[in-house]
Amino acid sequence: MTPTELKRLYRIIKVQLEYGLDDLLPDHQLAKAPRWMRKSLFWLKNQHPEKPLGDRLRLALQELGPVWIKFGQMLSTRRDLFPPHIADPLALLQDQVSPFDGALAKAQMEQALGGPLETWFSDFDLVPLASASIAQVHTAKLKTTNQEVVLKVIRPDIRPIIDADLKLMRRMARIVAKAMPEARRLKPIEVVREYEKTLLDELDLRREAANAIQLRRNFTDSEELYVPEVYPDFSNETVMVSERIYGIQVSDIAGLKANGTNMKLLAERGVSVFFTQVFRDSFFHADMHPGNVFVNPEHPENPQWIGLDCGIVGTLNSEDKRYLAENFLAFFNRDYRRVAELHVDSGWVPADTNIDEFEFAIRIVCEPIFAKPLCEISFGHVLLNLFNTARRFNMEVQPQLVLLQKTLLYVEGLGRQLYPQLDLWETAKPFLEEWMMNQVGPKALINAIKDRAPYWAEKLPELPELLYDSLKQGKAMNQRMDQLYQGYRASKRQQATGKFLFGVGATLVVCSAILVDHTYEQLSLATAIAGVTFWLFSWRAYRR
């Protein structure tokens, strides 16, 4: 380790001990070193003994900085790995840090764009509109159109910090996985690797710009969701320019009510937006926490969601969508056998899984949930319980499903915060059933034909020539097959002749031996010569 890494490691250990996080350590040989540190570094006492363990963990991660804050946010979504008293406080982590100098932000943008900001923008505000651990946002106007925009810029000093902390995380994960077999269930190496990929993706604003453009295209002219326009000419790896929007934050219930918002319709539209993204587009915003969701203040009787920060998105393939939809429908029809079979069919659990045992495990977990009225059942927690049960049957972690579960919990939480009587199942079931009908039966066939229509329109003019070539090739193939068959027949005849001649020759040789014993020497010699002659003919027959 370099001196810088050792200094950072000491800082991490210091914060952990000051928040009493050594309480998280199991009774294991590996835990002796931190406990020895606790005794040796006697001046580092637990300064928050009165706080619950989950809150202490949250505060420690917040103090350690951006990499650890985002790591805690990711861990809060892995409820298949962590109990509620740990995951719930982590969900409250706030990704807000002190802003850096606006003049430095401007210089960073000018370097990325290759010229003074005044060339393209007016009214650039040096005071940031918002500041987070990875990036900072400033406002301005486009000179050509006078359109208000926001400029998002990556912090100039963030990459070395991230690289150093990720290196320490990887090292600690390897140590834990190697020395503590019982901790392998938490998959520390895989969790850190997944987090590293997510975090590094957020450092490339080109990815966020592409995601926002795609999501905006998917909801063009939609009354349900609006995604601000991105200006790709002014966007690159470290800077992104997009349309500035004005809205009411979705968590501002008082503000929404004061604006006369139709809260029931707003909540239902949130559910509709989620299922549309998942099942129609196979592309969904996977970071829909309240800070990224606003409501258009215009037309409060017909409210529209506004989605920001598309840095994290999820995708599902057609098989995942079909199995997910069938799982939901089977769940709410209490067909647990079908749920178990779908998990095996999809490959989410091993093919040799005992269906009866799996069905029984799902039934035990889910029946208590369905004892409540449907309007009180959490879709997200149904999915969570399903994944937790499947993990006991060796279900591999499916990153796309983890993102889906996190997003569903966000959407459901927001929906019930807006309208506590929201019946998610009543809103979602018609959507799922219609989607399933579009995937099977006559309607699906018609859609498939429509999808392939451009291909057939291109190929139809070539059909006569293709048909002629096929017939010509078929005729040539038949002739070739006839030739091969005739050759095969001739070969079989030759082999039969050879066997016959060999048999005759062998018989004559045996006869010559018998005749010698009976003093018919001349006849015996003639018979032997004839036998050898027949052998020669049989050998020639085999050689052809």
UniProtKB/Swiss-Prot annotation:
<dbReference type="InterPro" id="IPR050154">
    <property type="entry name" value="UbiB_kinase"/>
</dbReference>
<keyword id="KW-1133">Transmembrane helix</keyword>
<feature type="domain" description="Protein kinase">
    <location>
        <begin position="123"/>
        <end position="501"/>
    </location>
</feature>
<keyword id="KW-1003">Cell membrane</keyword>
<dbReference type="InterPro" id="IPR011009">
    <property type="entry name" value="Kinase-like_dom_sf"/>
</dbReference>
<keyword id="KW-0472">Membrane</keyword>
<dbReference type="InterPro" id="IPR045308">
    <property type="entry name" value="UbiB_bact"/>
</dbReference>
<dbReference type="GO" id="GO:0005886">
    <property type="term" value="C:plasma membrane"/>
</dbReference>
<dbReference type="GO" id="GO:0006744">
    <property type="term" value="P:ubiquinone biosynthetic process"/>
</dbReference>
<keyword id="KW-0547">Nucleotide-binding</keyword>
<dbReference type="InterPro" id="IPR010232">
    <property type="entry name" value="UbiB"/>
</dbReference>
<dbReference type="Pfam" id="PF03109">
    <property type="entry name" value="ABC1"/>
</dbReference>
<dbReference type="GO" id="GO:0010795">
    <property type="term" value="P:regulation of ubiquinone biosynthetic process"/>
</dbReference>
<dbReference type="GO" id="GO:0004672">
    <property type="term" value="F:protein kinase activity"/>
</dbReference>
<feature type="transmembrane region" description="Helical">
    <location>
        <begin position="519"/>
        <end position="539"/>
    </location>
</feature>
<dbReference type="InterPro" id="IPR004147">
    <property type="entry name" value="ABC1_dom"/>
</dbReference>
<keyword id="KW-0067">ATP-binding</keyword>
<comment type="similarity">
    <text>Belongs to the ABC1 family. UbiB subfamily.</text>
</comment>
<protein>
    <recommendedName>
        <fullName>Probable protein kinase UbiB</fullName>
        <ecNumber>2.7.-.-</ecNumber>
    </recommendedName>
</protein>
<comment type="pathway">
    <text>Cofactor biosynthesis; ubiquinone biosynthesis [regulation].</text>
</comment>
<keyword id="KW-0997">Cell inner membrane</keyword>
<keyword id="KW-0808">Transferase</keyword>
<keyword id="KW-0831">Ubiquinone biosynthesis</keyword>
<keyword id="KW-0418">Kinase</keyword>
<feature type="transmembrane region" description="Helical">
    <location>
        <begin position="496"/>
        <end position="516"/>
    </location>
</feature>
<keyword id="KW-0812">Transmembrane</keyword>
<dbReference type="GO" id="GO:0005524">
    <property type="term" value="F:ATP binding"/>
</dbReference>
<comment type="function">
    <text>Is probably a protein kinase regulator of UbiI activity which is involved in aerobic coenzyme Q (ubiquinone) biosynthesis.</text>
</comment>
<feature type="binding site">
    <location>
        <position position="152"/>
    </location>
    <ligand>
        <name>ATP</name>
    </ligand>
</feature>
<feature type="active site" description="Proton acceptor">
    <location>
        <position position="287"/>
    </location>
</feature>
<feature type="binding site">
    <location>
        <begin position="129"/>
        <end position="137"/>
    </location>
    <ligand>
        <name>ATP</name>
    </ligand>
</feature>
